[in-house]
Amino acid sequence: MAKIGQILGGQLNFYQHSEISKVTIYLIRHAQSAFNAVYDANKPDPMIFDAPITELGETQARQARNEVEKLDINNLIVSPFTRTLQTAELIFGNRLPFQINSEVREQLCNSCDVGSPPHELARDYPHLDFDHLDDCWWHDGEKDHRGISVEPEKILLERADRFVDFLKRESIHSTAIVSHGNFIRALTGIKPKNCEVIEFDPH
């Protein structure tokens, strides 16, 4: 499991923590998705919207569960994409309530980063609460030739900053956050592999 400190001015700064202020936030990237499995940067977008995870992804999530079970996690925040919901269910089952939070969604770069509206998510996951989500909870802006609204890096970084402020303000701890590669990169400077777990200090 990777461990990271806060990134300031391009430097990675590690902190000593007392037992009270000990880092207890874990960032988990989703398992391999159907989009991940076929994506090639030199080829056209395969146009797989809100991609589910693959059989390999299911295996990755079950393996991650063995690691995560050893951690002190009492809260769970999950991105509303299908791949993160599936990953979280395989890792955590019904052990913890899901807090669905669109702030931890992926940067919209490709078709897989266009989500499903709340009524569709509620149909597929009737035991979870999506009522607080906007109909279009992913980035919405000027569309490119694919009909996709790419989220600028500046907006991604601002969203990551807002989320860090939320973690600090609410004194979030003992928490796993099932999210995405670019969002985790915006928080930490590290783009994790599928189902990699990163210990995160928001301070």
Name these PLM-found stretches:
Residues 5-8, 17-21, 71-103, 122-138, ...:
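Conserved histidine-centered catalytic loops in small-molecule metabolism enzymes
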Residues 37-38, 42, 46-52, 94-158:
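Phosphate-handling substructures
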Residues 23-24, 28-100, 195:
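Active-site-proximal alpha-helix that buttresses catalytic centers in soluble enzyme cores
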Residues 161-203:
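Active-site-adjacent alpha-helix immediately C-terminal to a catalytic or transition-state-stabilizing loop
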Residues 78-79, 158, 178-179:
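Short beta-strand scaffold positions
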